[in-house]
Amino acid sequence: LALTLFAGGILIGQLLGIPMWESVLGLVVISGLFAMAGGLKAIASTNVFQMALLILVSALLVVVGLHKAGGFSALYEATPGSFWNLFQPNDSPDYPWLAILLGYPIMGVWFWCTDQSMVQSVLGAKDLKTGQRGANFCGLLKILDVPLFILPGIICLVLFPEIKATPDKAYIHLVTNLFPSGLIGLVVVTMLAAMISTIGSALNSLSTVFTMDIYVRKYKPAACNKDVVRIGR
């Protein structure tokens, strides 16, 4: 949750020109109200909406960025070879291959298989087969990470070398410099939907853990469904 708030604060703050603490506070308040009012069903619906928008916007950004950079061949030639190699030397200060090899599987299994905000999405499916299809579809979508979310950072470095000092702002820097005002507005909506959905999922999972593992188990085992929903909200 903290990492999501940090990333969201950077994105929204850079787009709207407001301090990070205001961005974070706004995201928490809006996400909390959204989770309270709609619950998991509303969060799932927002996930589908923001997924489609995010893929569309990112694909368009890659196409426009590659065109500005002179095509993929020109982009490849303009960047160091290490940018296209996932496994860096073990003495790399950023991503040594040993850390990737040992760390990513652990983090991946933790997030995708045990994190409550992810598990609740699968457990909320109407049946086992639907849950399995959703999990497999989510895995297929991860393949899009490389072309849609890594390439924009490399494109930004080629077009705007000064961004190397603040790499966290590369995506939004590319958006604000390549897209017209109307598309920037669409990106703002997409980012807000993605942040609210992610934060709402985390808040909903925290609410579930507190309600079921603390309130029901420790204080009121005989609580009716109405009480459980009220405490969760």
Where are these regions (language model features)?
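Loop-to-helix junctions at membrane interfaces in multi-pass transport proteins
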Residues: 52-185
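Transmembrane alpha-helical segments of multi-pass small-molecule transport proteins
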Residues: 3-6, 12-42, 229-233
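Transmembrane alpha-helix interface/packing and boundary motifs in multi-pass membrane proteins
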Residues: 32-39, 106-107, 158, 189-201
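Residue-level recognition of membrane-helix boundary sites in multi-pass small-molecule transporters
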Residues: 22, 41-42, 130-133, 185, ...
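Residue-level recognition of transmembrane alpha-helices
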Residues: 24-28, 47, 135, 190, ...
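Membrane-helix boundary/coupling elements in multi-pass transport proteins
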Residues: 1-10, 184-216
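Loop-to-transmembrane helix boundary motifs in multi-pass membrane proteins
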Residues: 211-233
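Hydrophobic alpha-helical transmembrane segments
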Residues: 21-26, 52, 97-101, 183-187, ...
